[in-house]
A protein has these predicted regions:
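A general secondary-structure signal for short beta-strands and their flanking turns/coil
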Residues: 5, 56-58, 124-125
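Mid-domain beta-loop-alpha active-site segment that forms a flexible
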Residues: 13-35
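A structural supersecondary motif
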Residues: 36, 40-48
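Electropositive phosphate-/nucleotide-binding environments in soluble metabolic enzymes
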Residues: 21-25, 29, 55-56, 68, ...
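C-terminal active-site/capping subdomain that shapes the small-molecule cofactor and substrate pocket
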Residues: 62-171
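Hydrophobic alpha-helical scaffolding
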Residues: 17-21, 51, 133-136
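Glycine-rich phosphate/diphosphate-binding loops and the adjacent beta-loop-alpha structural elements
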Residues: 50, 56-63
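Single conserved hydrophobic/aromatic residue that forms the stacking wall/gate
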Residues: 1-12
Length: 171
């Protein structure tokens, strides 16, 4: 948000790789590449750890912001983004099960599911917490968005917004 310049994350996933000297894992390198398309040069670094779970990635995030904030402001901002879902669940099993029962063809299409009570604001400028990345639904939405943008560069956002009914405010 704005000119914020530093972010840290830890991704716990089904395999590990930590080979990039500047970014750590490919996650931060990929994110840095994305932000560079918006002329933002951010200090990004990520680590990953291998766990025996096929459900979804668990990501710890830590953001240092220029402007002061509060936990409620962070929750309000996250709630206003339809690609972000909030949850009270602490287990990937519960979130994954919700997606299988309630999601479009058993998928959660939101880009991330933030564990609401894990959000912490320290010294008014540092936000941390945990989120889950719904792997299959996340990549399905990204693939749809890339294809629609290629085919309809001037109206793709309207077409993607038509999927809004399949995003969850809460899981």
């Amino acid at each position: 948000h704005g000119d914020d310049r530093r972010q840290r994350q830890m991704c716990i996933r089904d395999r590990n790789d930590h080979g990039h000297p500047v970014y750590g894992t490919h996650h931060a390198e990929d994110a840095a590449g994305l932000f560079k398309t918006m002329n933002l040069d951010l200090d990004l670094f990520s680590s990953a750890m291998k766990v025996n779970s096929q459900y979804m990635h668990t990501v710890w995030f830590n953001l240092k912001l220029k402007e002061p904030t509060s936990k409620q402001k962070v929750i309000d901002l996250l709630s206003s983004n339809d690609r972000v879902s909030l949850t009270e669940h602490h287990s990937t099993n519960e979130v994954f099960s919700f997606g299988r029962d309630q999601g479009l063809y058993g998928r959660i299409l939101n880009q991330t599911v933030i564990v609401e009570d894990s959000i912490n604001v320290r010294n008014d400028h540092e936000v941390s917490g945990f989120c889950f990345t719904p792997q299959d639904g996340n990549s399905i939405l990204s693939s749809i968005a890339a294809t629609v943008r290629f085919l309809n560069p001037h109206s793709y956002q309207d077409k993607i917004n038509s999927l809004g009914g399949f995003f969850f405010d809460r899981v």
